[in-house]
């Protein structure tokens, strides 16, 4: 009897294949690969019915959750399968790779003071003494001693598959701008749910085999526990224990009701802790997860650096198999914005982004735009005299092709920054928007205007006028900042609908680092018509280097 187990995948998943081979060998099954392309993976096994049933049951227990694959179905095959690709008898799984069930086997059994020997060479530095080749009770006592130091408020050094870290309960210093951010590690899913504003898809992603980092905002009542972070209310990087020593240490700490520890990148040095040769590093991924479980890898360097948008879109068309074309929208924190229509080899820009970066000139244009504009600036000056003066004195020059700079301009007119700086104003507005706890903000106008070239552009002046009016109405900063982000997403959802109808194109590629903001990703998914087929970067970086 032959069965074909079919999976959906969005990236290479050697760990999946190694588990399948290992489980097949346990039951003495014949096996081979049946499907292997960008999105599908099939694994054919053959043998006696009882062995196949045990294989299926073992898979249901041992296959971990993953960001990059999930099981679709199993199909019975009639007769012998065709000659397919034969797989190596030895799994590719490394000595440090374990399924969740395999990792649990290394934890101490209830009532016992003994640990199973670790499968690689580990050394402990305890009380000035180096201890190696520990097993049984001695290994248990070494982990117990490390946990005790942490519980006493001290820090320890610990080697992980992502490098050497200093581990403590609260962190050892206040992070400065530009430094590596501390990682906040809840010791289990329940602790993550207790401490952070987190949705179920994010919890599921944290628990996957890849153990990614996700930016989460702490709940207000726990903010004092994040004193090492720069701006904790806007979000901190969170992950769960991602390798075996961290999982064992977490077990000892949880026994004393510890919910979370802090990891800070450490240089090679001396100190008490746990050390081993890191021969099989585990990739560290940062992801953004939407309410509908869309997962985007947001690390810019993933897959290699991309020099420009033309190169990026070529890679995205290829990996998503969009050879006939698509609408392509790119929204970045740092790079120019693009909105293209791609038809075969032809690529055409359908929207121009050319936004002046002079706040004083913009103020003047609003004041001279008729009675309503004059009245608006007069009222604004009366209510916010200091802010109005700063705007009128900001004689910056230049033009931007990045729509996010106009988000920053809105932030400056809302008083979120003392002196005009596009990048700083962007960060201030996005930070305020993250702190908003509601679901809907005020509707800020993002109107289009037709230009002499025939292309459409954004009527940026009216965007700022709308923001000024809401500020005069007394809308608080967080609500208004979220309204800007919400309205920007709605603007793009409506424009994608119109363009898809005009050009009879239902395929859309979305890219750019603005999608790494979860609130914006959720909103653009909400406002984009459901009949459109959205495609995102899979193995290609989310953005290019500007």
UniProtKB/Swiss-Prot annotation:
Entry superkingdom: Bacteria
Name recorded for this polypeptide: Protein HydE
Family matches, as Gene3D superfamilies: 3.30.420.40
